[in-house]
Amino acid sequence: MTDTPDVQPPKIEFPCERYPIKVIGDAGEGFSDLVVEIIRRHAPDLDAETLVVRDSSKGRFLSVQVLITATDVDQLQAIHNDLRATGRVHMVL
């Protein structure tokens, strides 16, 4: 039997400029605006120029990606929690 070392996710050094957040949810009116509004609560420096919105191949889902300056783990967790609380978000990457 061989021992495998615990695999750890890469460490993020804060503040982390241009940190990508990708949100996938049901396509529908106002989804991208909702995502931007929630993220902007926690990252007021969100640059709308970095916003990328894509439809899924069948049009059922949308992905919304933005870049923020991540300040700490608590900020990222708060963004994740608020997005998931909407009931419209399936994944936050």
Swiss-Prot record:
One of its GO terms (cellular component) is cytosol. HAMAP family: UPF0250. Belongs to the UPF0250 family. NCBIfam families: PRK00341.1. This is UPF0250 protein PSPA7_1111.
